[in-house]
From Swiss-Prot:
Protein name: Cytochrome P450 monooxygenase cpaH
Pathway: Secondary metabolite biosynthesis
Cofactor(s) required, per the database record: heme
Glycosylation site list: N15, N306, N412
Residues bound to heme: C453
Keywords: Glycoprotein, Heme, Iron, Membrane, Metal-binding, Monooxygenase, Oxidoreductase, Transmembrane, Transmembrane helix
Localization of this protein: Membrane
Length: 509
């Protein structure tokens, strides 16, 4: 720039000879800055939808330009229904953000989440796992540390350990049934999402810490359990804004202080529970035996973080699966009649229902699988990041650094994978030729690969035992007001559902 031009600019901006000149100069400077900013955003947007390496993958244009589209739907709770419709409109490969692509083919499970011999693992290097509110645990760490935590925890979820834990499981189920009989005798209509949460939180509390929360005994949520359910929803919000670290702390100030304090309280409660567990002598191998064993050398924050994850992952999701199975059986009277017949002709009394005998209930297992398909407990995307250098996913080249994933709800409800995907049809799991083209490998409710849910055996056992016992004890139907339970559910990483009111009638024997 010439000396003359520099002098003109200097005078335009810094000349203070008159107030009018100052005002004009300020307006000019502000306008220039705004124009530069707007022009930059427009150019970035054009680049992202035309020249960006992911530009060839279809999806909403706004999503290709800015992640705000994705974050908005995370916060409103309609994310999985929006993604499902987008997959229907754009196809099996869907761009949902400038740097994120989703898939709905079963092959993508292997490419993204499966073991990758000779290739680096697709890490959980995303705000969902690395955000400031994420605990340090088996879910969030990578590599050798994850494998170490998994080896320690696996012993508590082994078949041998589950056999040792069965008396604890049966005791909690007996109490659930007893309480439901009392509710029915008092003329009440139980809200089953709450009752299933009471049971699963009490059970995981006893298996992890050696003591229940007293939810079943007191017929209401323990304050800590209520807080956990709220914290889970807030985690979805922090996930949404975690993509904007430069404004994260500002945005968090808009979260009510009482809700922010729940994170701190949750950590304190976890710490106190762990301490009581460490002071106890448990006479069976529970879920935390190896975590608290000094010989394994874990730091206290590692023990607390993994215990916190056990409580959250081992309770609400199982309760959701139980609620979904009970609900969808009311939507298919033929399936309901079949599962009732199977259970009530297999057992002579409630005492016959145990961890061994429930394995012969093939139709009940099909009902569970179908409920897990149509209403997966973890319906959203649990993303991974493509390693540097890029890789092929389902035959598509994806650049390194891109977030990729599968939304369970979307892959399970896709017409590309299932006949009548929105219908609850247990027979699709029993060899019915009508559904022989179904891609059952697409359904992975407990995730997939070396980082799948370590507690899936416990969750399935709980479901079989609870459902078999309830169906043995009661006839049931939906109470008025719960007909749209599925349609009214929202997703904040996990489901947020309306009350599920069930009218129970004890079986006369």
């Amino acid at each position: 720039m010439s000396q003359f031009a520099r002098e003109i600019v200097r005078n335009a901006i810094y000349n203070t000879s008159s107030p009018d000149a100052d005002s004009v100069s300020l307006r000019k400077a502000t306008t220039t800055i705004l124009l530069i900013g707007v022009t930059y955003c427009i150019l970035v947007g054009i680049y992202r939808v035309t020249l960006h390496p992911l530009a060839k993958y279809p999806g909403p244009k706004l999503a290709a330009v800015t992640r705000l589209w994705h974050s908005y739907h995370l916060c409103t709770g309609d994310i999985v229904s929006v993604l499902s419709r987008a997959h229907e409109a754009y196809g099996p490969v869907l761009r949902i953000a400038p740097d994120e692509v989703l898939f709905i083919s079963s092959r993508a499970w292997d490419d993204i989440y499966g073991a990758r011999p000779g290739k680096p693992e697709m890490d959980k290097d995303t705000p969902l796992y690395k955000g400031p509110t994420a605990p340090h645990s088996i879910v969030t760490v990578d590599g050798e540390l994850h494998r170490f935590y998994r080896r320690l925890l696996a012993k508590g979820f082994s078949d041998a350990a589950l056999r040792e834990q069965e008396p604890v499981i049966q005791r909690n189920i007996n109490l659930l049934v007893e309480k439901l009989h009392k509710e029915v005798a008092a003329g009440k209509t139980p809200e089953m999402t709450a009752w299933f949460n009471y049971a699963t939180f009490d059970l995981i509390g006893e298996l992890a810490f050696g003591e229940t929360y007293g939810c079943l005994e007191n017929s209401h949520y323990h304050p800590w359990v209520e807080m956990i359910l709220e914290v889970m929803k807030l985690r979805a919000m922090t996930h949404a804004v975690g993509y904007y670290p430069w404004i994260f702390h500002i945005l968090m100030w808009f979260v009510p202080k009482s809700l922010r304090e729940k994170f701190v309280t949750h950590r304190r409660y976890t710490h106190d529970k762990v301490q009581r567990r460490m002071d106890q002598k448990i006479h069976y191998k529970d879920l935390t035996t190896n975590l608290v064993d000094p010989q394994n050398g874990l730091e206290r924050y590692e023990i607390d973080g993994n215990c916190s994850t056990l409580i959250i992952a081992g309770s609400e999701t199982t309760a959701t699966a139980l609620s979904a199975t009970l609900y969808f059986l009311t939507q298919n009277e033929n399936a309901k009649r079949k599962v009732i017949g199977e259970i009530r002709t297999t057992f002579n009394n409630a005492g016959d229902i145990n961890s061994i005998s429930v394995n012969q209930l093939k139709y009940l297992s099909a009902c569970m699988n179908e409920a897990l398909r149509i209403f997966p407990p973890g319906p959203a995307v649990f993303p991974r990041r493509v390693p540097q250098g890029g890789d092929f996913i389902d035959g598509h080249w994806i650049p390194g650094g891109t977030q990729v994933g599968i939304a369970h709800y979307c892959i399970n409800r896709s017409r590309r994978n299932f006949v009548d995907p929105d219908k609850f049809i247990p027979e699709r799991w029993l060899g019915d030729p009508t559904y022989q083209t179904d891609d059952r490998h697409a359904v992975q409710p407990f995730s997939y690969g070396p980082r799948n849910c370590i507690a899936h055996n416990l969750a399935r056992l709980e479901m079989r035992l609870v459902l078999a016992r309830l169906i043995w004890e009661f006839d049931w139907e939906l109470a008025p007001g719960s007909e749209r339970w599925e349609e009214e559910a929202l997703v904040f990483n996990v489901w947020s559902t309306k009350p599920l009111m069930i009218k129970f009638t004890p079986v006369a024997r």
